[in-house]
């Protein structure tokens, strides 16, 4: 495995890329091959793998591990023993950036988080994202967890070819149907954490925002 040197993160560390997808041209680039911590943009590849290998109608039982997050870490509020569909989990992942959803998805699709992460790395390489290495499906910081702006473009563009992904990230809210460990049905509603998707902010003039909740630079 390659060893990557990642500079200490600060406010000035950034990367910017502007891509012409149809013409397959890079219109603007600033440090697009610089290794950076991806934070919740990790969930782009989590969704890609889940959509490729999972069945959206499968019913998933949430494990204890999937609920084991600190109070200040973003979760959808799942409880151990909850049952909900893979479709519900993906919506919680993409709309509300649920780290609990990421782990539940990984365990269901591949049997374990570790096996799922192996698949994430394999699929990233298949897309040409050779400057990327994942160690978890949610993006919580780890020194060996990194990507580049160019690789993010490759992965996000691949996801945009999937109509189900586009539909999920375009919603203004989603209501999931769950059954608790004790067998009681209940619902949870999630709204986007992205200001553009929620309507709390407008895109610059002449720019159309294709919303992705977690396309940002700060730590999850």
Annotate each predicted stretch with a short phrase.
Residues 3, 7-150, 159-163:
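Active-site-adjacent loops and short helices of periplasmic peptidoglycan-processing enzymes
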Residues 9-11, 112-219:
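Penicillin-recognizing serine hydrolase domain
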